Amino acid sequence: MRYLATLLLSLAVLITAGCGWHLRDTTQVPSTMKVMILDSGDPNGPLSRAVRNQLRLNGVELLDKETTRKDVPSLRLGKVSIAKDTASVFRNGQTAEYQMIMTVNATVLIPGRDIYPISAKVFRSFFDNPQMALAKDNEQDMIVKEMYDRAAEQLIRKLPSIRAADIRSDEEQTSTTTDTPATPARVSTMLGN
């Protein structure tokens, strides 16, 4: 019986490892991006803190922006916008529920390669209770903080796709240089007599 349980457990581990299954909230950051520079206009802002936390959770060593190393990829955080749209209304016409939309733009600069733009969009619903103004503000602040965390997770999850795009562009460059000869074939301009 113990042998059967061990066999089933081993089989389950092999199946989940073979299909690419991984734990939630973990991203396989490419090895070329394990050392990175985080560049932000607001280094102590909520998005910068959330991205810094996610990078550290994924084993990325962050270097200072003023570092002398120029061979390190850089994640540059750009514009953040939060919009509120009315999702539902009370009978009297007041807004009952908002849908909040956070859009984050960033770019990844790989030295000697290219600049890759990435973005993240997070949606959350927020109930607007007019009788509880203070509680409403606190709840909205908590939701916005959670949205920053989710946006940071989405940005970090896009790092492997950037690495794949970088590899793909390298392959395209090598295939175009090997397909076309460096010098055109020689053509004789002499006419026969």
From Swiss-Prot:
Keywords per UniProt: Cell outer membrane, Lipoprotein, Membrane, Palmitate, Signal
Where a lipid (N-palmitoyl cysteine) is covalently attached, the residues are C19
Region: Disordered; residue ranges are 166-193
Q: Which residues form the signal peptide?
A: 1-18
A Pfam family per the record: LptE
Asked if the Swiss-Prot or TrEMBL record annotates the protein with the keyword Signal, the reply is: yes
InterPro entries linked: LPS_assembly_LptE
Where in or outside the cell it occurs: the entry states: Cell outer membrane
Q: What are its GO biological-process terms?
A: Gram-negative-bacterium-type cell outer membrane assembly; lipopolysaccharide transport
Q: What is the protein's membrane topology class? A: Lipid-anchor
Q: Using the UniProt record, give the first listed, main subcellular location.
A: membrane
Compositional bias of type Low complexity: which residue ranges? Answer: 174-186
Q: What cellular component GO annotations does this protein have?
A: cell outer membrane; transporter complex
List residues with covalent lipid attachment of type S-diacylglycerol cysteine.
C19
Q: Name one GO molecular function term.
A: lipopolysaccharide binding
Q: Which family does it belong to?
A: Belongs to the LptE lipoprotein family.
Outline what the protein does. Together with LptD, is involved in the assembly of lipopolysaccharide (LPS) at the surface of the outer membrane. Required for the proper assembly of LptD. Binds LPS and may serve as the LPS recognition site at the outer membrane.
The record describes its quaternary structure and partners as: Component of the lipopolysaccharide transport and assembly complex. Interacts with LptD.
Record protein name field: LPS-assembly lipoprotein LptE
Source lineage: Bacteria, Pseudomonadati, Pseudomonadota, Gammaproteobacteria, Enterobacterales
